[in-house]
Amino acid sequence: MTDHGRTAIVMSRLPRLVDPHALWLRGLRAALRRIQEHGGTVVRIRQTAGSDFIQRGAERLGLPVDVIADGSSTAGNDASDTDIHTVRDRRVMSAADTVLVLGIRAQGNIHRALVEYLASGGRVELVDLPGLQPSTVRDELIRLGASTWPPSAEDQAPFNGTSDAPVQSHHSMSVYEIVPFPPPDQWVFLSHSTRACPGPWPHQSFCDYADSLLDELPDADHSASATLARIVAQRRVISSPQSNRGQHPVVCLTEVPLMELPLLRQYQVHRTRWDFEPFGVCVDRDWLQSRGARPVIYGDEATWLQLSDADRPYFQLCPAQVESSGDPGPKTDWRIEREWRHVGDLDLQHLPRDKGLVFVPTFEVAMRLAGISPWPLTLAPAPIDAI
């Protein structure tokens, strides 16, 4: 790499949920340190894959960053998202002296742009980590003139070192306890299923989120399991206005017994995620009701118009096709969820041990939560698609 050169770091589109141990993150740390070592400048365009992480990583290392115009206006008014991304990828490469390549997909925008860039005499270095690029793509780019750079373990290391310490709490179970969940005819709980949290945690800034990944901190894991651990450790379920007409922040629960929960599990295409993951907390219905939780009011537009402001946070449009007419897929009758809602965050600080239950899919996950949960743990029934 030329000293004091302008360097672009490129990669294919990232998954919504970032794995804190992902190869591209290791490669990104290494690439930024390489630019720092050579006194270079980072070149980036907003809204390209990983651009915000590149920006934050450069800030952490004190690297100068040149943010250039994305050139999307040159793609034309009728340009597709693919066309716009292609313009941006080509533009950031043309503005750089060297392009450092992380993960790429075969025949993706980055792959095609790199082939063109190499044909024009551009300088390309592949960050050489096993599995970071498909071998066929890697071999092709090398034949076209790309070089490889194998970063050391030190290059890839978290910026501030890593901590494998588990989340701690001043409350803990002295005995690891797995209990059977009550049968449907004895079910007295309302259940809240947790799911992964792509992007920052509620009330977390993007900078803090990016730092947790660059530093490989324990809270960088935003999986459904980690979300549940966070709820248990904080003794609080954070409310959300998502999927709530009127944008009222609520916590959603279901009175469907845990044994029957897998029957509700389905993939929501418009949200690109599954509903009713096998992670969550069950809370005694009477305890919740005494704190304001109420059953959802299912109805149509006429029902909504008749509701008071106090009742509207509990409204759910039904039948679903009235609200989802643009969705060509099958419609859901939300009444099968038998939903309850709690307006605002749900504080579990004073939930008695016999009024709560934590459900997880495996013994391994249960063992990780045993040290922080004041409530017993149970194994959730397997999802229908996993049987």
Positions of PLM-derived features:
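NAD-dependent ADP-ribosyltransferases
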Residues: W149-I387
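Glycine-biased, small-residue-rich flexible motifs in mid-sequence functional cores and linkers
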Residues: M1-S172
